Regions:
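Short, polar N-cap/turn motifs at the start of nucleic acid-interacting alpha helices
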Residues: 109-117, 183-185, 204-227, 247-260
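Alpha-helix C-terminal capping/helix-coil junction sites
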Residues: 32, 93-94, 178, 200
């Protein structure tokens, strides 16, 4: 057991170390419960301290990731490690800062093309509350392209073959890009954190960023309904500013700092 865990330690993976240790301990405990073993050799091994990730992509990494996804989406990169539909969904994550699980379970009924809003039902959000996401023209274009690329008109927007979900493949997409030498040492969630950090650097207050990310604190039902709609305009301004900033990075134009409006 120590030899196994030492190999993980040498790789600098404390989270993996703790997960493997817990799994091994459960296996031995099961053996004791079945009277196959008389002791658990993993029981006295201490956990490794875990630090929350604070990884944020640099402008160069962000631009590089976008260019890779764009090449895959448009079919100009030979033998891509992920599908064009996965690349399209990841680009929407970069445009909207929403969780991958929410993007890849998006259904056509959740999207209002006319008003430019994506409504994520509480059954799909992490905090269980309905979340309204403003869609910029660039974000809507990705969704429209998915429709013309064989997805819809019913069911999932970013669907695989025969309309099947890509949620599981999406969890591994950034890792596949990294193993192919097309992405750096970052995760899908780091991409979302990068957008949040970018909004902060553009001058938006934490309250607006929290509502963009759907991380606002819970409260009375009336308060939650008020907050959800009260921040629609702020969320729209924030994601439009982020879209301009992202486009500026992609095209080599520096964005100016935004001074958010106040009501």
């Amino acid at each position: 057991v120590h030899e196994l865990l030492d190999r993980i330690t040498d790789r600098g993976k404390p989270v993996t170390y703790n997960r493997v240790k817990a799994l091994v301990s459960r296996i031995f405990k099961h053996g004791i419960d079945r009277e196959w073993l008389d002791h658990n050799p993993a029981a006295g091994i201490p956990k490794k301290p875990e630090r929350s990730r604070e990884r944020v992509l640099t402008d160069e990494e962000l631009t590089g990731l976008w260019e890779v996804l764009e090449a895959i989406r448009t079919g100009t990169r030979p033998t891509p490690p992920i599908s064009s539909m996965l690349a399209r969904g990841l680009q929407l994550m970069l445009r909207t800062a929403q969780r991958g699980g929410e993007v890849f379970t998006m259904e056509w009924g959740d999207v209002d093309d006319a008003s430019g809003w994506w409504t994520i039902p509480g059954t799909k959000t992490k905090n269980g509350t309905t979340h309204r996401v403003p869609l910029t023209q660039a974000a809507l274009a990705l969704i429209t392209e998915a429709r013309t690329d064989g997805s819809g008109p019913d069911g999932l927007v970013f669907a695989g073959r025969e309309g099947r979900t890509l949620e599981w493949q999406a969890k591994k997409a950034v890792s596949k890009l990294r193993h192919a030498g097309l992405a750096g040492d970052y995760t899908r969630h780091d991409v979302r954190r990068t957008v949040a950090t970018g909004l902060e650097e553009l001058g938006f207050p934490t309250s607006t960023i929290a509502h963009v990310l759907n991380q606002q604190e819970g409260g009375p039902r009336a308060t939650k309904i008020y907050a959800r709609h009260h921040f629609d305009q702020e969320k729209t301004v924030a994601l439009e500013a982020w879209g301009r900033h992202l486009d500026g990075l992609i095209h080599g134009v520096t964005s100016a700092r935004v001074v958010p409006f106040r009501q």
